[in-house]
């Protein structure tokens, strides 16, 4: 029985890439800077001391980071026994966004440039806004700017509740985000508005990667909170991913846990499992791994590393999340059967010590574990697509156009 389990620690980069200067990210290092802060006692909120990741270290994380940066992460053990194969991978795609990273992991790099709304104020074309107001039967809109998702709620959440005007905002990513109150505006109405926005952006040729519904609750600034009912409307990948090939060519199964299905616009997904929060995502993953049959991929995105701690530049929170993940990692490892492979990776960086609130262009870790996987270094990988090609080879699908089999 062959099964592959792919775990994306969303935004867990391990050091700046060779082309980081194009993105203003030279010197960024999500893992290294978290470890450094922990070693200095600067991340002792809700946790204490050096970054403690013994299970990830056994899978080769510290070695992969050392390969990427040329140095051992502060306070971490570079001499621990390694029981998995490890690599550090460069992104071939032109961006440092979620769809690009995930599609490339599945063998389809994004070699075109996404569209962006680069103006920080009055970010969106008036023609687009007028269409949304008309088709969505809206009294108007708020925002129309670049912003952090949590900051904009404190600024405009109350006015939104009073007026019924949705909050439109964007970031350095190729996104159009809509924040609305779950109760006063309504979740279904928000989702409908996002569908309209997706249609208008696609038909208008804006080439925007994702429309994101950002529902929230609460009654006043300081109390507003985003809920787990986020929904991403992505464009479809430009070619068949390894997920699609497994389903089409081998009659296989692909189980999405978390936001994976949204990222791939449901292409190549046979089952969707929603869960919110690190523990709930882990619980759902364990359940799906236990139930997975032959020719199945269980694919989980652990979004909190990015959304709760990376973008919010919360080093202590990110460290605590990593340590929680590490404590629970043996639960996954013990479910890996004789012919199975477990792959732990990321989709980009989001260094919580970095300026601003955006992603960082970094190498990602590629940690591969299984009874038939030979432990040791797989070196520097030129594209995340090596993961997709490895999975294609493993299941015997037709090869991907990009990437090399690592095993």
Swiss-Prot record:
Keywords per UniProt: Cytoplasm, Isomerase, Manganese, Metal-binding
Single GO term (MF): phosphopentomutase activity
EC class of the enzyme, as a word: isomerase
Keyword Metal-binding appears in the UniProt entry: yes
Function comment: Isomerase that catalyzes the conversion of deoxy-ribose 1-phosphate (dRib-1-P) and ribose 1-phosphate (Rib-1-P) to deoxy-ribose 5-phosphate (dRib-5-P) and ribose 5-phosphate (Rib-5-P), respectively.
UniProt gene name: deoB
Cofactor notes: Binds 2 manganese ions.
GO terms classed as biological process: 2-deoxyribose 1-phosphate catabolic process; 5-phosphoribose 1-diphosphate biosynthetic process; metabolic compound salvage; nucleotide metabolic process
Family statement: Belongs to the phosphopentomutase family.
Top-level lineage group: Bacteria
Name this polypeptide is given: Phosphopentomutase
EC number: 5.4.2.7
Any one of the GO CC terms: cytosol
HAMAP family per the UniProt record, alphabetical: Phosphopentomut
Species of origin: Enterobacter sp. (strain 638)
Catalytic activity: 2-deoxy-alpha-D-ribose 1-phosphate = 2-deoxy-D-ribose 5-phosphate; alpha-D-ribose 1-phosphate = D-ribose 5-phosphate
Localization of this protein: Cytoplasm
């Amino acid at each position: 029985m062959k099964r592959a389990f792919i775990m994306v620690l969303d935004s867990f980069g391990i050091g700046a890439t060779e082309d980081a200067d194009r993105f203003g990210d030279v010197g960024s290092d999500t893992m290294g800077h978290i470890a450094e802060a922990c070693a200095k006692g600067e991340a002792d909120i809700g946790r204490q001391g050096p970054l403690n990741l013994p299970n990830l270290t056994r899978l080769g994380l510290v070695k992969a980071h050392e390969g990427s940066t040329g140095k051992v992460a502060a306070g971490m053990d570079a001499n621990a026994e390694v029981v998995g194969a490890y690599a550090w991978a460069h992104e071939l795609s032109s961006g440092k966004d979620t769809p690009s990273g995930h599609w490339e992991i599945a063998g389809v790099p994004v070699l075109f440039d996404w569209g962006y709304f680069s103006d920080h104020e009055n970010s969106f074309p008036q023609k687009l806004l007028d269409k949304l107001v008309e088709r969505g039967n809206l009294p108007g809109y708020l925002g129309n700017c670049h912003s952090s998702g949590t900051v904009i709620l404190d600024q405009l959440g109350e006015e939104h509740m009073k007026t019924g005007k949705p909050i439109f905002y964007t970031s350095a990513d190729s996104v159009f985000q809509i924040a609305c109150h779950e109760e006063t505006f309504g979740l279904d109405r928000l989702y409908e508005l996002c569908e309209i926005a997706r249609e208008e952006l696609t038909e208008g040729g804006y080439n925007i990667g994702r429309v994101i519904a950002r529902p929230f609750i609460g009654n006043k600034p300081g109390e507003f909170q985003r809920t787990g009912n986020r929904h991403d409307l992505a464009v479809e990948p430009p070619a068949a991913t390894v997920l699609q090939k497994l389903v089409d060519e081998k009659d296989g199964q692909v189980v999405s846990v978390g936001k994976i299905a949204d990222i791939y616009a449901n292409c190549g997904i046979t089952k969707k499992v929603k869960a919110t929060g690190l523990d709930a995502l882990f619980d759902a993953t364990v359940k799906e791994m236990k139930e997975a049959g032959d020719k199945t991929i269980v694919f989980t995105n652990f979004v909190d590393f990015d959304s709760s701690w990376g973008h919010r530049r919360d080093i202590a929170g990110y460290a605590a999340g990593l340590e929680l993940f590490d404590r629970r990692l043996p639960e996954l490892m013990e479910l890996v059967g004789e012919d199975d492979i477990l792959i732990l990776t990321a989709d980009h960086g989001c260094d919580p010590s970095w300026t601003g609130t955006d992603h960082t262009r970094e190498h990602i870790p590629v940690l591969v574990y299984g009874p038939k996987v030979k432990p040791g270094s797989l070196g520097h990988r030129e594209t995340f697509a090596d993961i997709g090609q490895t999975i294609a080879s493993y299941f015997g699908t037709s090869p991907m156009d990009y990437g090399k089999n690592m095993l």
